């Protein structure tokens, strides 16, 4: 089979075009990422003689986030604008061993949005949300979740719908 010079140049041109398109798409996604999640950990926390879940998200810069509570199944959604994921050692989805959390997953539903979803066994809601300044590893964004029943969950869900952004 003989390939003409013209066909070979056309194939090379298409390859360069696809490579250029790939680079543009990759650069576009990174252009939005002004911040990056560099770590995440979960532990138990005592609040009013009850055990809850403490979620700590470590980032390069102070985190701006919006929180949303959903039911059927219960879950907490954390959207982080202009944030990418730089957590090579953390699986993109996994189980949680601290109640009321049961699992997590993260990704970028849009190039400019980093999203973390915490699946909940029960109708838990954030009772404390705060930021800590860098201490060696980076900025920390902390959310304490506690199951205080379905009514408290619905009240918190409604409040977060009205004012989802946390700075």
What are these regions (language model features)?
Residues 1-11:
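N-terminal secretory signal peptides that target proteins for export/translocation
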Residues 9, 29-167:
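Signal-peptide-cleaved, periplasmic/extracellular N-terminal interaction regions immediately downstream
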Residues 14-27:
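Bacterial N-terminal signal peptides
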């Amino acid at each position: 089979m003989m390939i003409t010079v013209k066909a070979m140049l056309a194939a090379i041109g298409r390859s360069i075009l696809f490579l250029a398109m790939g680079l543009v798409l990759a650069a576009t996604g990174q252009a939005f990422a002004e911040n990056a999640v560099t770590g995440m950990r979960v532990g138990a926390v005592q609040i009013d003689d009850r055990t809850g879940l403490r979620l700590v998200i470590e980032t390069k810069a102070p985190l701006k986030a919006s929180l949303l509570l959903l039911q059927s199944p219960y879950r907490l959604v954390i959207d982080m604008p202009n944030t990418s994921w730089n957590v090579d050692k953390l699986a993109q989805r996994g189980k949680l061993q601290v109640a009321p959390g049961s699992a997590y997953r993260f990704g970028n539903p849009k190039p400019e949005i980093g999203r973390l979803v915490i699946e909940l066994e029960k109708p838990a809601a954030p009772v404390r949300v705060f930021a800590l300044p860098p201490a060696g590893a980076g900025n920390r964004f902390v959310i304490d979740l506690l199951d205080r029943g379905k009514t408290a969950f619905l009240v918190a869900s409604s409040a977060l719908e009205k004012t989802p952004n946390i700075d």
